[in-house]
Curated annotation (Swiss-Prot):
SUPFAM superfamilies: (Phosphotyrosine protein) phosphatases II (SSF52799)
Protein's UniProt name: Dual specificity phosphatase 29
Localization: Cytoplasm; Nucleus
A Gene Ontology cellular-component term: cytoplasm
Domain Tyrosine-protein phosphatase: 54-202
Active-site residue list: 147 (phosphocysteine intermediate)
Organism for this UniProt entry: Sus scrofa (Pig)
Complex and partners: Homodimer. Interacts with PRKAA2.
Amino acid sequence: MTSGESKTSLKNAYPAAKKLLPKVEEEGEAEEYCTPGAFELERLFWKGSPQYTHVNEVWPKLYIGDEATALDRYGLQKAGFTHVLNAAHGRWNVDTGPDYYRDMAIEYHGVEADDLPTFDLSIFFYPAAAFIDAALRYEHSKILVHCAMGRSRSATLVLAYLMIHRNMTLVDAIRQVAKNRCVLPNRGFLKQLRELDKQLVQQRRGAQHRGEAGEKAGEKEP
């Protein structure tokens, strides 16, 4: 990855992000939105980018990559990465850890997960999203979220981040990621993302209704 490529992809990512965020905030769409089924969601991934390289920027300063990217310490340092989230942490997966990057200015977070439909990755959604969000608050930060292939576990955690901290629906999050990298979470992870989507949509609708009720109450006051 050259610095020129990074700058170009970064410039292209911002307009895309700006186009998506208002869509989630539109009241009409928020009321009508219904979480699609697994097959419909998979079709969104298939319609996405065929691009599948070692690492791709999917959101400003946020990258999804594979094991080779995570193990290339020189490449990470040269590209300016400051944070690494390993979604395949552990001895039998991508065995890096904080010690692997101890001589580098990299903050590490590990998630010990298996790429199996029966594995409950949802318990890591909020901690992983919090790590990503905290990393992106730094002006010059650059975070790599990876697993073994950069297609399922890492993509799932990035999607959860966009839903939790960027107020995206699952559909908008998939479109944002899939247009920049070829990814496809397994069916079990998709089911968990669907459940998260339903919860977040319900919370946002509840907050919207409470806000509307508060405004009406304020209007009635003399």
